[in-house]
Amino acid sequence: MAIHKIKIFAGRDSKYLAEKIAASFGTTLGQSEVLQFSDGEFQPCFNESIRGCTVFIIQSTFPPSDTLMELLMMVDAARRASAYKVVAVMPYFGWARQDRKDRPRVPIGAKLVANLLMAAGVDRIMTMDLHADQIQGFFDVPVDALYASGIFVPYIKSLDIEDLSIAAPDMGGAKRANTYAKLLGTPIIISHKERAKANVVGKMTAIGEVEGRNILIVDDMIDTAGTICMAADMLMARGAKSVRAAITHPILSGPAYDRINSSALEEVIVTDTIPLRQDQNLSKFTVLSVADIFADVIERVHKYKEISSIFFK
């Protein structure tokens, strides 16, 4: 099977990560720019030929609106420039919390995003730790749903923590927590929360042995940090020795940084799918890069190799 030339490009908000992915792959980013108009419109442009190439466009959709539109327009531009195939690499897939109708008269935002990407002409999607696995079914093209456990688990093992337990911050995260517990050979704790409304948690309890344990909370994203910080404080109040968190996507909106820094959390381990704000106190944060994982998968996809063996589930 013929292997077409590969070119890797980045959206403006993911260039920091795309450069690391390209370097790990053994190349440099392709030349592109985004022209900005005075009314707020913008126009992406590839500054080199991509005719007949397999084009990988790296863009996390955070913040959710302009980044998505920029990605869609880059996919469209690549398709119109006669690229052989166009792959959207979305380390963080925004809008993923809208995976179903949870009340009357609301959209299914994640399905709409999938429709838009396919309409733009994308041939494949790569992403990491989707908020809901069923989003893969919204696409009619292949979706490589990768897992950050491949970098979190080795790091946690390197800490050599005694009396370690894995905790889910809510019932929805039980499957992920169970996976980490199996990989690390630890007990599991399930937290249960009652939300008063979006981003507002009411009360919280825990199921499992907490007293005397060093606890690692695992989740796919951290937004306002209300749930994680409340869980950490609750677990410490119930006798935990320490509480850490391993979170793939550090959205960290609103009061998140202040909440984390004033909480019982000893360490917050995140990835670089979304950059941390450098104007904040980051003393509790440890950042692990997903660049090598994505570079490996890009190479395997480009050379038509299987990728299932590198999945950590």
Question: What is each residue range found by the language model?
Answer:
Residues M1-K313:
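PRPP-associated nucleotide enzymes
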